[in-house]
Amino acid sequence: MAKEHFNRSKPHVNVGTIGHVDHGKTTLTAAITTVLAKRGLSELRSFDSIDNAPEEKERGITINTSHVEYQTANRHYAHVDCPGHADYVKNMVAGAAQMDGAIIVVAATDGPMPQTREHILLARQVNVPRLVVFMNKCDMVDDEEMLELVEMDMRELLSFYDFDGDNTPIIRGSALGALNGEPQWEDKVMELMEAVDNWVPLPERDIDKPFLMPVEDVFSITGRGTVATGRIETGIVKTGDEVQIIGLGAEGMKSVVTGVEMFRKILDEGQAGDNVGLLLRGIDKDQIKRGMVISHPGKITPHKRFKAEVYILKKEEGGRHTPFHNKYRPQFYIRTLDVTGEITLPEGTEMVMPGDNVTITVELIYPVACNVGLRFAIREGGRTVGAGQITELID
């Protein structure tokens, strides 16, 4: 069969498999690619190729993850699967892509286990909008009542963590059966993908969000003015656009973009993902510096205090050798900026051990442009000791 040309017209969605160890996450991932490959929508990926997950570095943290891609009739998916529990925690808190939805795998033979609960909580903390449940190993359970019990437990658990437990699709299947080509279980994988298509919402594309660019470098061109360079994070910027420059005490600085350049070529507009230089009217070179953010006016505000979900590196990962306590003051590396901040631990938490995953409140020494979902690294003496993402802005 001739290879289909990669089609960008389908909307792109990031998903992943989560759930307790040995409940069948990786087998399901392999089964999805196998079943979709038969329908010409995916490349087949074997269990072993997914299980031997390569190491990646993200914000100074090593994470083992496998990336698989596939399509349904309606969407293009990038799917992540992690081998170990710690890799899941790290990937969800500090990984590259925000998950737009997740497939939580639960074995019908066991029902929900501690990591099932932990992964659902984590999905809630990092704002994964919706989960779909795949009840695996149903070919090993003869008792219909047992299946209904597991389904009830899962719905209760989802509701407890503020997901829509009543309406979340729960598919009963067998990943191994589907992987082995048994038609009744292959159909269940197709049913699962249909549920993911319909239940997981389409993410807002970066290009459709308001314009925002963290400043990486600044220089001046004689006779033309000041140029700020950086990678556009979201949105679109055109010549003539009014922008605001915020962070590092530059509150309310406004300017007009008089040119957008990329590799010394003039662009009509810069888009999310482009590395550009913006020529800014009426701004002196010393008024703007690395770490500030340029955005459309009023779309993003500077904040000093926020709540965050963080993962603290183990000693073996290059992290701290000792725990830290309340009022710990490391540096927070946010976008292109290093800023000192003070950590307040949740009530009743005395200290945080290397390897822990915890919700903290941070107070920075000055306001920084930030938003919910923004990921950052925690550094001490130039090395990364943790990573996290903002879950709530306080002030």
Swiss-Prot record:
Give me the segments passing through the membrane. Answer: none
Chief localisation class: cytoplasm
Q: What are the boundaries of the region G4?
A: 136-139
Report which superkingdom the organism of origin falls in. Bacteria
Q: Region G5: what ranges?
A: 174-176
Question: Annotated region G3: where?
Answer: 81-84
Q: What class of enzyme is it?
A: hydrolase
Annotated spans, G2: 60-64
Cellular component aspect of the GO annotation: cytosol
Catalytic activity, as annotated? GTP + H2O = GDP + phosphate + H(+)
Subunit organization:
Monomer.
Give the family this protein belongs to, as stated in its UniProt record.
Answer: Belongs to the TRAFAC class translation factor GTPase superfamily. Classic translation factor GTPase family. EF-Tu/EF-1A subfamily.
- Function of the molecule: GTP hydrolase that promotes the GTP-dependent binding of aminoacyl-tRNA to the A-site of ribosomes during protein biosynthesis.
Protein name per the record: Elongation factor Tu
Which organism does this record belong to?
A: Porphyromonas gingivalis (strain ATCC 33277 / DSM 20709 / CIP 103683 / JCM 12257 / NCTC 11834 / 2561)
